[in-house]
Amino acid sequence: MPSSSKPLIIFSHGNSFPASTYGVLFQSLKARGFQVKAIEKFGHDPRYPVTSNWPHLVQQLADFTSQEVEKSGQPAFLVGHSLGGFLSLMCAARNPVLGSQAVRGVLLLDSPILGGWRATALNVAKRAQLVGSVSPGAISRRRKFQWQNRDEVLAHFRSKKAFARWDEQVLLDYIEHGTHDGTAPDQRLLSFDRDVETAIYNTLPDNLEALLKRHPLKCPAAFIGGCQSVEMKQVGMAMTQKVTKGRIMMLDGSHLFPMEKPEATAAAVEAALRNFC
């Protein structure tokens, strides 16, 4: 039986950031009248391993969404940041109906769609096993993963340029949910396995253009990007413009703008989703 008449958002996180990192964003969306459900960590369930082009992660999202749609009685909006945006797009393309309800729309948060020669180059790099030296996986595989306590974790991330602009509560949520106590005394560990993070980077989808030709989206799509996003500039926006039919909005911030400006992100997400209706 339906548990709520509120619109349902299935949110998918960015690589290495468990869904609980986005708690401030989720609370703001709930205050705006949405239900928000999310898989906590992609890539950590052995039933859905990380492989090239992420088919099992897409299936994990499809299975989770179907369950949540059936529980709530509401069709889902698929919203995702970075990795999560790509998974949302592929999931909606392959599964226009989830839980016996048509997907209402896809919203990409700084997930620019790779196509054309860049996708071909990525495919070549993957086949030649060179992708690990050119993707962010070159950094993630050496990422620091243990500290003595929470204060040391907080000091570590506060000193990082990528985290310097984060909302304070979001950073605290990341320390709380993105790390955990180890079995040894004085040990705080990264919760998102850096080997999984690296595997996700090294298996980036090079087939999005072909997938969307075989399975055209049956629902509207939109994109919200960060004005200072390096990732967006690297990938280009040609495919994104085509898929979203120009439904593009920009917010001040980097690729990680949902962590930097969670309240502004929630307002933009609401505007984009209401525009689908």
Walk through the language-model features, giving the residues of each.
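Conserved serine/cysteine hydrolase catalytic core
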Residues: 169, 178-241
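Conserved HGGG/HGGXW glycine-rich cap/lid loop of the alpha/beta-hydrolase fold
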Residues: 4-46
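The conserved beta1-alpha1 loop
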Residues: 10-14, 81, 225
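Catalytic histidine-centered segment of alpha/beta-hydrolase-like enzymes
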Residues: 253-266
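Gly/Ala-rich beta-loop-alpha elbow adjacent to hydrolase catalytic centers
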Residues: 80-84, 88
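Short glycine-rich catalytic loops that host catalytic nucleophiles or stabilize transition states
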Residues: 39, 249-254
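Flexible "cap/lid" loop of the alpha/beta hydrolase fold
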Residues: 101-146, 233
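Active-site loop/oxyanion-hole signature of alpha/beta-hydrolase fold enzymes
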Residues: 38-79, 93-99, 113, 119-125, ...
